[in-house]
Amino acid sequence: MKEDTLNFEEELKQINICALGPLRMNNALIQSKALAEGAKLVTITSQAGSVEWRSTQNKDTGGDYGHHMSRAACNMAAKLLSEEVKGMGYSVLMLHPGFNKTEMTKKYEHIWEIEGAVDPSVGAKRVLYEVIKNGMDETGMFINCEDGLQIPW
């Protein structure tokens, strides 16, 4: 481990925002009793929360603890929620919008073209497509909006 690579306050902040934030939002929607029958609760997440992806695509690089841990926790929260609300007639989807050209990914600007990074408007269209296409049969699935395939845990 490199010296001074961990900032525990920052790691906790990321977990609070990226893992608990979507859970808070979904909880508020459910508690409001304003959701229609068949409502879809969508969590925008990242393949960075996939342990399998992390051990293959970025093998031997480590780092970004807060980001990866917060996304894995976010995905687990959504999976648990999907089981809990299935009986209420709601589905829960976890969607990775793909590699988007944003301020958050700017540090990877040198590989945007190589890795196929897209404008966020393209990522948003991909997300909408998956939301429209998927429903109760896919509840609890972790889906890559780039190709529609399920992302392994």
At which residue positions do the language-model features occur?
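Catalytic loop of short-chain dehydrogenase/reductase
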Residues: 1-17, 23-24, 30-86
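Soluble or luminal CAZymes and related metallo-dependent hydrolases
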Residues: 21, 73, 119-123
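Short connector loops/turns at beta-strand edges and beta->alpha or beta->beta junctions
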Residues: 47-49, 98-102
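C-terminal helical subdomain
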Residues: 94, 102, 106, 110-153
